[in-house]
Amino acid sequence: MKEGIHPKYNDVMVKCACGNSFQTRSTKTEISTEICSACHPFFTGKQKLIDTAGRVERFRKKYGM
């Protein structure tokens, strides 16, 4: 590898909007996220089902189908 062409690799704290934080390595100095594995519905098991049937019924009612 050539010297002097690679960016500096730092230890960084990643801070989530939910208050969770964890350490990783990156070329950035700080990382802020809105959602992480501690608060994402897929990882927490608190997924919401989308009511697509209601939307279809509203469409059919609106356009007389």
Curated annotation (Swiss-Prot):
Part of the 50S ribosomal subunit. The keyword Metal-binding applies. One of its GO terms (biological process) is translation. It comes from Geobacter sulfurreducens (strain ATCC 51573 / DSM 12127 / PCA). Binds the 23S rRNA. The keyword Transferase does not apply. Pfam families: Ribosomal_L31. One of its GO terms (molecular function) is rRNA binding. NCBIfam families: L31, PRK00019.1, PRK00528.1. Keywords: Metal-binding, Ribonucleoprotein, Ribosomal protein, RNA-binding, rRNA-binding, Zinc. Gene3D superfamilies: Ribosomal protein L31 (4.10.830.30). InterPro entries: Ribosomal_bL28/bL31-like_sf, Ribosomal_bL31, Ribosomal_bL31_A, Ribosomal_bL31_sf. The lineage of its organism: Bacteria, Pseudomonadati, Thermodesulfobacteriota, Desulfuromonadia, Geobacterales. GO terms for cellular component: ribonucleoprotein complex; ribosome. This is Large ribosomal subunit protein bL31. Belongs to the bacterial ribosomal protein bL31 family. Type A subfamily. Binds 1 zinc ion per subunit. Its cofactor is Zn(2+). Zn(2+) binds at C16, C18, C36, C39.
